């Protein structure tokens, strides 16, 4: 009996209906395809890379359910897919756009995850392949452009089939994939991601040939799944309850968002639907859909670009950065609206009344629906707030949201404070202030809803720092706008000193010196105020941003953030890192707290470390962190160099007029004696004609540092001394 039972399954192919369905079509004359730059990239880069991978062999051909003795495979997997089919479709120009091809890849991986157990070797192999797939897709050209000639070329090339071996086919079946429907089940995926590194490959590869028949061989992955596969329907129901964990199963990227997924095609049975959600979250990182969205909207955006205000243009650049591949590892869950139905998050819309995502923000930005920067910031913060509200604080998607919000807040805080045009001056202040209010409101919501007190405290401190930065910017603006006035005068005075030797110009020089001293007397009060304002600015936690904004404002505000963006991404050389280390050691103790804050806010791995005992390894820090530190340290050291001047100025201002006059008299008397001695030897007649003019060289030399009151004393002193020397 037992033997008969064994034989029965082997004969299954011939008996009931478990015959392999026809493989997916690879060409369709009625459905015209085309060749685009993105499809060419998929064929020449993505498929070629994956095909050569050591884990690719199970996916070379459609799953042969009869050979592998998987009677229920086609009951569970409604849309089989494999890499060999995708390759042939690309060669035959079957696809109209790259998104269709990517959908087939997603289907293939999804089928594997649906049919097999999360711990099976084949699942780990699929995850490793999917990771590479997503990395390659992220580098695909952003705009899809049709290429004219290559259409006929594809049909002649079908050597791909020859490359596959019988053993390969068998295993392929096990991992074969179903149509593009992502799923939410498979919570264990999270733990799987690390496992990807494990290489069951050699074992499987070695036994490939034996895989089909004996379940005991290394290929048990396929065989094992078979058993669980039959009873999976009940487990599926159980998994449904774990609605939020669906996101936690992102095979390739360590990102999970219960709430972010593209709506998948309708599903026929609950099991498939469930897996779909999971797969979707795994597929979310794929950038192409995002690019498609951008491509479709670019023309409209480009046409209206000029109408965006200075601030909204900056906001648009922030949005573009958040959508860039630089942040894709943790931003992908927020690319599209949450598909609660596909992810089986039945209570999502009961809890979240105002869903928000980056594609919606982009659509509103392109449609000019934001009146100002604060409207844009409110939507972005609403998106993060929703995430904190719905997911538990220790959920991975919350950690991803925090990372992305750090990027957003840091860039938003650097918004140019004031546009170049004078009329627009008041505008920047308003958005910045309202931004603070907005962030405080969103932080309050998220704290009450999600209960993640740590993130709220961080946000509150960041808010306080941003407000202090704002004050510092305004104060330094006022201070620095006055400071440059003195520079041209010093240059003039130097020139005058060189000309003092000429008798004819002496009289003119004397008048100029007096005129300048009078001007200085007028400029002195604002200069004092500027110095006083500098003091509170130093107390502010962060002056780095302020200093940078002021410098850039002097050039072109409109282009400032572009150059800054490029600069931030530049990696540091060894010499630059060494110099930065030396500069940090030169900072006073009170400035080091800000250095630690910059590092902790930008480096998640150091966020929980003790600020008093933090160790900085410059090799492990990101280029953006190093550049931010460099800017901050430079601004601190520049201020340090300026301090002696302002300090001496304050001391002089504090002295009484009488003391100043007396000191100047003494200095002038000494210098005038020397000067008069030198002049008497070379230019006696001139001194006789104008006794008061000769000594003017002395006072003029000091005029740059003396206050206006010393002008009169110097002139009177010079006349009396010159008469004595005669």
Curated annotation (Swiss-Prot):
Pro residues composition bias: residue spans: 15-26
Compositional bias per record (Low complexity), positions renumbered to this chain: 248-261, 523-540, 692-726
Signal peptide: none
Region (Acetylated histone H3 binding) residue spans: 78-80
Entry keyword set: Acetylation, Bromodomain, Chromatin regulator, Chromosomal rearrangement, Chromosome, Coiled coil, Isopeptide bond, Nucleus, Phosphoprotein, Repeat, Transcription, Transcription regulation, Ubl conjugation
Domain Bromo: 34-140, 306-415
Crosslinked residue numbers (Glycyl lysine isopeptide (Lys-Gly) (interchain with G-Cter in SUMO2)): 414
Entry keyword annotation includes Cell inner membrane: no
MF GO annotations: chromatin binding; histone binding; histone H3K18cr reader activity; histone H3K27cr reader activity; histone H3K9cr reader activity; histone H3K9me2/3 reader activity; lncRNA binding; lysine-acetylated histone binding
Positions in coiled-coil regions: 453-524, 645-684
PROSITE patterns per UniProt: BROMODOMAIN_1 (PS00633), BROMODOMAIN_2 (PS50014), NET (PS51525)
Function description: Chromatin reader that recognizes and binds acetylated histones, thereby controlling gene expression and remodeling chromatin structures. Recruits transcription factors and coactivators to target gene sites, and activates RNA polymerase II machinery for transcriptional elongation. In vitro, binds acetylated lysine residues on the N-terminus of histone H2A, H2B, H3 and H4.
Record comment regarding domains: The Bromo domains specifically recognize and bind acetylated histones. The NET domain recognizes and binds the 'KIKL' motif found in chromatin proteins.
Family in the record: Belongs to the BET family.
Subunit-structure text: Interacts (via bromo domain 1) with GATA1 acetylated at 'Lys-312' and 'Lys-315'. Interacts (via bromo domain 1) with GATA2 acetylated on lysine residues. Interacts (via NET domain) with CHD4 (via KIKL motif). Interacts (via NET domain) with SMARCA4 (via KIKL motif). Interacts (via NET domain) with NSD3 (via KIKL motif).
Protein's recorded name: Bromodomain-containing protein 3
């Amino acid at each position: 009996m037992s033997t008969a039972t064994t034989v029965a399954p082997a004969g299954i192919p011939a008996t009931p209906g478990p015959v392999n369905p026809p493989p997916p079509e690879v060409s369709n004359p009625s459905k015209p395809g085309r060749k685009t730059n993105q499809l060419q990239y998929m064929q020449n880069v993505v498929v070629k890379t994956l095909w050569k991978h050591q884990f690719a062999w199970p996916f070379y051909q459609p799953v042969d359910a009869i050979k592998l003795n998987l009677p229920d495979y086609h009951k569970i997997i409604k849309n089989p897919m494999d890499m060999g089919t995708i390759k042939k479709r690309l060669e035959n120009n079957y696809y109209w756009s790259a998104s269709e091809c990517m959908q087939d890849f997603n289907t293939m991986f999804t089928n594997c995850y649906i049919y097999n157990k999360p711990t099976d070797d084949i699942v780990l192999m699929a995850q490793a392949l999917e990771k590479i797939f997503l990395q390659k897709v992220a580098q695909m050209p952003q705009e899809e452009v049709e290429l004219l000639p290559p259409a006929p070329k594809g049909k002649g090339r079908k050597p791909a089939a020859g490359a596959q071996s019988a053993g390969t086919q068998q295993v392929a079946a096990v991992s074969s994939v179903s149509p593009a429907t992502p799923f939410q089940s498979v919570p264990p995926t999270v733990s799987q991601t690390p496992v990807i590194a494990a290489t069951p490959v050699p074992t499987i590869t070695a036994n490939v040939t034996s895989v089909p028949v004996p379940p005991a061989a290394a290929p048990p992955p396929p065989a094992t799944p078979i058993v669980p596969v039959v009873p999976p329907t009940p487990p599926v129901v159980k998994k449904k309850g774990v609605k939020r964990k669906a996101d936690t199963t992102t095979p390739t990227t360590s990102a999970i968002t219960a709430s972010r997924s593209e709506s998948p095609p309708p599903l026929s049975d609950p099991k498939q639907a469930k897996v779909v959600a999971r797969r979707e979250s795994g597929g979310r990182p794929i950038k192409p859909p995002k690019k498609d969205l951008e491509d479709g909207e670019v023309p409209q955006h480009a046409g209206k670009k000029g109408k965006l205000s200075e601030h909204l243009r900056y906001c648009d650049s922030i949005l573009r950065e958040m959508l860039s591949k630089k942040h894709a590892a943790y931003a992908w869950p927020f690319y599209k609206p949450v598909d609660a139905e596909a992810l089986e998050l039945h209570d999502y819309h009961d809890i979240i009344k105002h869903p928000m995502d980056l594609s919606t923000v982009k659509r509103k930005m392109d449609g000019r629906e934001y009146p100002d920067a604060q409207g844009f910031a409110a939507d972005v913060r609403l998106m993060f707030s929703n995430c904190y509200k719905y997911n538990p604080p220790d959920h991975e998607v919350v950690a991803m949201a925090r990372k992305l919000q750090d990027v957003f807040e840091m860039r938003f805080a650097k918004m140019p404070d004031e546009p170049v045009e004078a009329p627009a001056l008041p505008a920047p202040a308003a958005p910045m202030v309202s931004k603070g209010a907005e962030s405080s409101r969103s932080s309050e919501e998220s704290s009450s809803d999600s209960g993640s007190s740590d993130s709220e405290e961080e946000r509150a401190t960041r808010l306080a720092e941003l407000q202090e930065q704002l004050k510092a910017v305004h104060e330094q603006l006022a201070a620095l706008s006055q400071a440059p006035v003195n520079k041209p005068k010093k240059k003039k005075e130097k020139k005058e000193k060189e000309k003092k030797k000429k008798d004819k110009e002496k009289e003119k020089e004397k008048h100029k010196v007096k005129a300048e001293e009078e001007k200085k007397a007028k400029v002195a009060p604002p200069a004092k105020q500027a110095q006083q304002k500098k003091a509170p600015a130093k107390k502010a936690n962060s002056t780095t941003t302020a200093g940078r904004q002021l410098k850039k404002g002097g050039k072109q505000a409109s282009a400032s953030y572009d150059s800054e963006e490029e600069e931030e991404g530049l990696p540091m050389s060894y010499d630059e890192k060494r110099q930065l280390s030396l500069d940090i050691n030169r900072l006073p103790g009170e400035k080091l707290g800000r250095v630690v804050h910059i590092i902790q806010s930008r480096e998640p791995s150091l966020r929980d470390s003790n600020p008093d005992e933090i160790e900085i390894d410059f090799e492990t820090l990101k280029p953006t962190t190093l550049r931010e530190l460099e800017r901050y340290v430079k601004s601190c050291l520049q201020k340090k160099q300026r301090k002696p001047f302002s300090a001496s100025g304050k001391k002089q201002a504090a002295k009484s007029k009488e003391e100043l006059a007396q000191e100047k008299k003494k200095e002038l008397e000494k210098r005038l004696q020397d000067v008069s001695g030198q002049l008497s030897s070379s230019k006696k007649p001139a001194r006789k004609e104008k006794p008061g003019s000769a000594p003017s060289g002395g006072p003029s030399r000091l005029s740059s540092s003396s206050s206006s009151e010393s002008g009169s004393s110097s002139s009177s002193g010079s006349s009396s001394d010159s008469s004595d020397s005669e």
